[in-house]
Curated annotation (Swiss-Prot):
Belongs to the glycosyl hydrolase 2 family. Its EC number is 3.2.1.23. InterPro entries: Glyco_hydro2_dom5, Ig-like_fold. The gene is lacZ. Keywords: Glycosidase, Hydrolase. Pfam families: Glyco_hydro2_C5 (PF18565). One of its GO terms (molecular function) is beta-galactosidase activity. It catalyses: Hydrolysis of terminal non-reducing beta-D-galactose residues in beta-D-galactosides. This is Beta-galactosidase. Gene3D superfamilies: Immunoglobulins (2.60.40.10).
Length: 138
C-alpha cells in the first residue's frame, strides 16, 4: 500500500479540464492526430456499412456499424442511448429494430430481398436526429 503525501497528485476536486491533442508518429512521420475535447458532446451519428452493393435473391447480408461521435470525431465510450432502425425497400433488418449503444457503438445486419432496387436504412437517435445510408440491390 502506498501513502499519498500530496493529495492533489491525481487532480484537484473542481479542477478545470482543457482540450487536448494527441499526435502519433512512426519513424518521425505523423500518422495520426486526435483532438480530445474537454467536454465531449454527442455530435455525429456515423453509419458505416461493410458494403453498399447487395445481390437480390441470395440472402446477401451486410453488417452496418453505428457510432456515436463527439465534436472531435472520437467514439463516445459511455454513450448508451437507444437508437431505432428502419428499412425501406426490398429487404429486411435481421434482428430487432430498437437497439442500444454499447461503448458508443452498435451493429445491425441488413439482408437483401428477392427483388432488385434500393434499400435505405434509417437510424434515429435523440441527440442526432435521423441519419440514412442507401444500398443498391442488383
Amino acid at each position: 500500500m502506498r501513502i499519498i503525501e500530496n493529495f492533489n497528485e491525481f487532480g484537484e476536486w473542481g479542477m478545470t479540464w482543457r482540450d487536448g491533442e494527441l499526435v502519433g508518429f512512426i519513424n518521425g512521420e505523423e500518422v495520426v492526430r486526435r483532438h480530445l475535447p474537454a467536454d465531449p458532446l454527442p455530435t455525429t451519428l456515423e453509419i458505416a456499412a461493410d458494403d453498399t452493393e447487395l445481390r437480390a435473391g441470395e440472402k446477401d447480408t451486410v453488417r452496418v456499424i453505428l457510432r456515436a461521435l463527439d465534436q472531435g470525431g472520437n467514439v463516445l465510450s459511455f454513450f448508451d442511448d437507444p437508437v431505432e432502425v428502419s428499412l425501406q425497400g426490398p429487404g429486411r433488418i435481421v434482428g430487432p429494430s430498437l437497439l442500444s449503444f454499447k461503448g458508443g457503438a452498435v451493429g445491425v445486419y441488413v439482408e437483401a430481398g428477392n427483388e432488385a432496387g434500393h434499400l435505405t436504412l434509417s437510424a434515429t437517435c435523440r441527440p442526432f436526429g435521423t441519419q440514412r445510408i442507401t444500398f443498391n440491390v442488383t
